[in-house]
């Protein structure tokens, strides 16, 4: 079985900017508007994006369920169920799902986020019906042997120990995120807290499965060498046989109160290789922002913190030599709130106080004076180039549509994004900076390679 992982934010690509000019930001219809959409009688939403250059397809099924939908005290159950979905059904023996895909010449995997869980296969087009039948089968016919459940729970506990408990940077990231959200479940880790993972049961997994896994709570995305009507016919033949589930529940969530004071998290750990400085701000997501606001934040963080031409990098790395690296990003692909993140790795003999003061000075200048037209133009070119690049990749297209639709956006929202980016003004950028680079809505964290004050050095817990 392939390694399953909680989804992490990946670095944005910066490529083929020369393909675009400042004179025109519009994309062709072929790059920006290619999706067909329809819905089956049982409520399954289907998106098809043809790409006929090679006889292969990417098939993804997305569920409107993630770590933020878990009941209190059961963190990690969404990710746990993702693992268990690769066990067995009435038709497929334990551990055979991925082996069958491999024998068919394809590959598969899955991931869990706070708002989504997704399963995908890349396969030859003439195997699509087989894959759709397999995925439809495990949507309703999952079988869980208690021994397999307990074994997989141990696998996840070990995954957490190796990826989090033995990684000081991951510990700090988790602690910052928990401090950032005063009430909202985005503050709990997707993989779950260790003490809660250890108590997850077969019954807990089935409860989550029965609550969220149904055609009327799912989105099917198929990209590649296919015709929309052919996909519709195959979907009717496979997924269409599954009845909708009237018991699929809404997704009530704790709402975040107003943030009135900044918070700090300072972690000392002798296992840390180098000191590092971090800050996260709560921000609106593309779902909750006012029109144009998230687009402005995307562009703002491109100017402020992305790459060697960014304001923060130029100031703290290139000019003042205070850091060996620095950067940041805006993450707005969420159902509820988004996040702005910054980081810096201090140079030798540079203190966190110096780093923080320098970065705060850059942010204060941006808030007060905004950015230049040249900076805005470069940011637009870079983002639109990335959009074109991603549009040339089946898997990227499937993720673009699947993720956005699963958190509540529309095909129109997705395909008109380049036009909205092109319309962002300098005034929009300045307003976004003034509103959302608010220290009261932030958590600042530091990681120091040293023994914690008044405590023994941390060590990974013994495996039980």
PLM regions with names:
Residues 2, 34, 39, 96-249, ...:
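Charge-rich, well-structured scaffold segments of protease-associated domains
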Residues 26-33:
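Boundary at the C-terminal end of the N-terminal hydrophobic targeting segment
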Residues 10-25:
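Bacterial N-terminal signal peptides
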Residues 36-41, 265-268:
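Short acidic-hydrophobic surface loop/beta-edge motif
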Residues 50-53, 463:
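Peptidyl-prolyl cis-trans isomerase
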Residues 161, 178, 247-309:
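His/Glu-based metal-binding/catalytic segments typifying zinc-dependent metallopeptidases
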Residues 43, 53-101, 279, 291-304, ...:
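Active/ligand-binding-proximal structured segments within catalytic/core domains
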């Amino acid at each position: 079985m392939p390694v399953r992982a909680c989804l992490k934010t990946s670095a944005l690509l910066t490529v083929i900017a020369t393909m675009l000019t400042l004179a025109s930001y519009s994309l062709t219809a072929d790059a920006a508007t290619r999706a067909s959409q329809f819905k089956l009688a049982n409520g399954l939403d289907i998106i098809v994006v043809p790409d006929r250059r090679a006889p292969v397809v990417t098939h993804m099924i997305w569920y409107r369920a993630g770590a933020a939908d878990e009941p209190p005290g059961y963190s990690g159950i969404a990710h746990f169920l993702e693992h268990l979905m690769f066990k067995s059904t009435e038709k497929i023996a334990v551990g055979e799902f991925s082996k069958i895909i491999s024998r068919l010449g394809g590959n598969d995997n899955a991931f869990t986020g706070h708002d989504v869980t997704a399963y995908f296969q890349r396969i030859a087009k003439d195997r699509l019906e087989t894959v759709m039948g397999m995925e439809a089968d495990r949507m309703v016919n999952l079988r869980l042997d208690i021994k397999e459940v307990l074994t997989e729970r141990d696998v996840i506990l070990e995954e957490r120990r190796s990826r989090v408990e033995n990684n000081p940077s991951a510990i700090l990231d988790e602690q910052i995120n928990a401090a950032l959200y005063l009430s909202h479940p985005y503050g709990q880790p997707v993989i779950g807290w260790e003490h809660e993972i250890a108590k997850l049961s077969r019954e807990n997994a089935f409860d989550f499965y029965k609550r969220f896994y149904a055609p009327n709570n799912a989105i099917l995305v198929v990209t590649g060498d296919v015709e929309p009507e052919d996909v519709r016919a195959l979907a009717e033949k496979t997924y269409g046989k599954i009845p909708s589930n009237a018991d699929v529940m809404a997704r009530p969530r704790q709402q975040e109160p107003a943030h009135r004071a900044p918070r700090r998290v300072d972690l000392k750990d002798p296992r840390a290789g180098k000191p590092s400085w971090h800050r996260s701000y709560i921000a609106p997501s593309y779902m909750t922002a006012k029109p144009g606001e998230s687009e402005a934040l995307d562009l703002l963080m491109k100017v402020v913190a992305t790459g060697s031409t960014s304001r923060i990098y130029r100031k703290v790395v290139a000019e003042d030599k205070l850091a060996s690296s620095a950067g940041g990003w805006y993450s707005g692909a969420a159902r509820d709130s988004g996040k702005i993140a910054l980081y810096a790795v201090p140079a030798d003999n540079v203190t966190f106080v110096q780093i923080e003061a320098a970065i705060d000075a850059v942010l204060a200048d941006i808030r007060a004076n905004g950015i230049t037209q040249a900076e805005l133009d470069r940011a637009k070119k870079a983002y639109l180039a990335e959009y074109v690049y991603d549009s040339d990749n089946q898997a990227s297209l499937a993720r673009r549509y699947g993720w956005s639709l699963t958190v509540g956006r529309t095909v129109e929202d997705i395909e008109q994004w380049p036009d909205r980016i092109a319309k962002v003004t300098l005034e929009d950028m300045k307003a976004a900076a003034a509103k959302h680079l608010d220290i009261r809505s932030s958590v600042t964290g530091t990681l120091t390679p040293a023994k914690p004050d008044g405590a023994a050095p941390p060590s990974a817990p013994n495996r039980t």
